């Protein structure tokens, strides 16, 4: 019973091998699916599972809604969008990869055409006709279950983009623009779609505006264009001071605060008492202002000079005559004051400015503004946007309106509006998508406030100002681009609707939409060839966020600040994982727990803390919401109730790290690994490594090649199982049940009754991927890890993929490592390895190469794939079948023919002798040439698969037919198994119904009235059970139903087989002019050898320098030779001490495994073994692994699996302490310092000092010497210089450059130098001669003129200099 209870606690694979964890913190929440960012984004884009009425305004639905309805120019007809539905994909993912197709589904959109009665005089016009139709709008690529797209047969990933969020941003130039170092402030309104609007100060403190980064204009031109007059502009931006003329004296309304800091230009008295408050020439201070307020002064008498030079806030008009005496923003002069007195104007409004916090910026800008009216301003903007075009009033108005105020041309988006409103202090987060007058005013006001010292500029690199644009959103944008193109074409055709009785299908051409989508997935900078070296590289690629790409940054322009780690990256973006090189900091990886919210900002989870007590409630916070919170780290000490124990807690607040009291804490981190990405979270003892080395370690794990036999790391972090299951490379059970059948290529599961719903089959068949080529030519192969009869749960791992071992990620091998020098062979990070590693195939990898042969239709005739090839010996054709295609299983080497192909030659005039020979020996030989597919140089391997694709309508050859037969046999096998299980299920239910029932008759010896027994049923054939007649009518009806189910089952299976058959035997849709394509897959086995690159997980990389025989390797006293020797000098300066700790813990893990193996060999009781395992797993009294839930068989299986070592998990930032490592070493009876005396294998002498020996997890990286090294004798030459090409891909030579020439000159090696620069390089005549001479056995050299010298002569002549060679 205990076992049944424990089923949900541990998965099938976990129970076979537990990982001992040292983590002190229990993870409060499970790690979310690692691919969720991709899957959710595209799910929201398609909304396939949502009803039409419930669809949100996102994705496809939003794109259609924004473009439709489309009205004709006359307004008499319009197209409306009703809804859409996606069809079923024609081929599944596997077939698309094989056939080179795109995995996509047809999109059909319901469009309604509404025609109005144009002759009617009513408004709105009555509807004359409505036509509805489903219109095909092209194919939409579908995302696979693992977050990738299959485009033209290759797997691609669309990387998320981190771009500037729409909204408004305020910044300054950091004093770089002007020589004085003055800060010039600017504001920029960034829309999601449309023109950018910039406001900026110049060194003279005038405010300018730019539209789309064009020529700048004074900002008041924009304000005038919006309909504001000078008076309105000044009243919006300035406070006013009013002055009255009373009895020949000027009185200003006194607001004492405004005088603070000014120097009094006259004595200030209290009017009633005459008391002097400030004397002339003194600065007015806060004390003076208090006195003024105390004496309740309402106004202040000022001398006339005080007004001179002040600026008017309003126009001054003589009300009796209507005459303008002065305009708003004019300066007050002596003449103006006289004129006002003469006209009886007793009141003046002036703008209030000071040098400190009320600058006269807008007033100064108005002074340089050349326009005087709205029309002039519009014309000025028109001239700036369209230089050279003659402006008209209508054109200028339309242009300005279209810039920011029309939804089709301008969209801030929901994010932009939210960011905009929050920044300029508008309460609501919602509003129109276009700009309003008030928006523009509020931005200018905020900018001026910042210039006046109120408020701060924004930090562009803050993650609250950068948002993630994922796949769905980018696809939607492309889709909208396509729809807008369609809209233009449709508008023109809509005018024909009334006359020609057209349907929606006739109006809409879906090509532009398909083209836009195809272009995005095929050639966008963010749609990338998936990194598929191993499961981790795939997961990381999908979780990547890039600042590059359309609408993003470029490498050249990105500065240091953008690339740097920012405080808001905490828990959102990994501070470690980023590429080395020009993209450093521009391409990042999401942290383990991070996700994006509805606005696209990255959020990280936090536990809520209430009154110093931590709760289990988890909230996701974005960088904007986090600023004002106090957030503690996850390793804070808590008591049993969750109260924080410390008096002062380190926390994050306002993007800074500080100490605070527990009562202030609002939130706490969820987990210590929350700040790092998936790759970094796989590095044990990450906390002991330098950041630069951790970066290399993260990146190099992604380059690890899957080995022949995957081996789990002895020292891991506990993330291995999560990465392996989420990556999609292993097979995970969709539903629980019992394993019915297992072989190397498929698993059949009989599903639990409670997990099958009506109409679903009770069988799950998993076809495994066998020896499939990845994008990087590594091998994808799945192996079952379950046995027939095993009971499994939903989510259990059924089969391991590449780089997985028992459902855990396994990128490399555990090797016995010694840190010591060894005869200089590990100088400069070189590595020396034991021959045993090569012999045991520890690092043998399989690489699969795809070679393609295409038969085309040429002008001279068709190419043919055949075994009948001219001038080729019998031995060369020994691997080909009668169709001319290589057999599967053939061992081939460089130069061997894989596919025989002949190409027609052009007709040549034949001599009589040739004609005679042709008449005797037949036609074929001479009019075709051999163009067979051969194995490229430097490659050898085994043919593991051949695919033949034939153009539709052409006769298939024998090989193509046999491949089809194999395919059909596989389909048939699956269907037979499924049918068998479902039939058994039906018959089981029938027997259950019939047993012990009273029969009224039936086949065989069944008498009416007798009871049905099991013996009777066993004797009668199953098919005849339905002929038994039962007294009970209800049972008879159930029997009838089951009989119908059986019939339906037969029909369903036949239909499914016929559908599959049709798909398999149909011809292929090949490119124009292509008749047949043959793809040959070669498996190349690569053993590890000197020159290959290896690395640990801590950035400790090196190249193998030598493979040493086992007997020469250093060995321990018990005779165990070490596998690998590393240089100890590689540790201290690199500061990656994690590798040493890993080595110690690895030794302990192996030692514990050895002890368990010893106990098993001594046949000790399960209780004794369980007691020892309890010591290992639950060493500190905390029950981490519940061994009580295992029965004896399961316990012994577990112990058996631990012989090779007890796997350990030391989570990042929460790992094993030094003391814990020592206690594990002692438990395994090993020295606590982890050092061992080693003996030199060659001499038998002990080394002077004990050496650090232990187990380290080493990876073989995808930088193999076989792929890099090549040799050339003769080959292709560059056209212009006639020098050999460079690089392996071009079969090129080595460059003998300038410095190499100097070296030979220094040695005086004249003949060698001459040979290098002539016959070995670009002396065309000389190299032909020497080749001939060598063939004849004559090794003399006759050098001529190098071709590059002739090129030099030509270049000099091109400069107009006459130069010739003079021959003596």
Swiss-Prot record:
Keyword set, alphabetical order: Antibiotic resistance, DNA-directed RNA polymerase, Nucleotidyltransferase, Transcription, Transferase
Keyword Transferase set for record: yes
HAMAP family cross-referenced by the UniProt entry: RNApol_bact_RpoB (MF_01321)
Catalysed transformations (reactions): RNA(n) + a ribonucleoside 5'-triphosphate = RNA(n+1) + diphosphate
InterPro entries: DNA-dir_RNA_pol_bsu_ext_1_sf, DNA-dir_RNA_pol_bsu_external_1, DNA-dir_RNA_pol_su2, DNA-dir_RNAP_su2_dom, DNA-dir_RNAP_su2_hyb_sf, RNA_pol_bsu_bac, RNA_pol_bsu_CS, RNA_pol_bsu_protrusion
Impact noted for substituting residue 541 to Y: In strain: K69 / isolate 8751, K69 / isolate 8752, K69 / isolate 8840-43 and K69 / isolate 8845-49; rifampicin resistant
CDD domains: RNA_pol_B_RPB2
Protein species of origin: Legionella pneumophila
MF-aspect GO terms: DNA binding; DNA-directed RNA polymerase activity; ribonucleoside binding
Gene field: rpoB
Protein name, UniProt field: DNA-directed RNA polymerase subunit beta
GO CC annotations on file: DNA-directed RNA polymerase complex
Family per record: Belongs to the RNA polymerase beta chain family.
Keyword Transcription: yes
Top enzyme class: transferase
EC numbers on record: 2.7.7.6
Stored PANTHER family: DNA-DIRECTED RNA POLYMERASE I SUBUNIT 2 (PTHR20856)
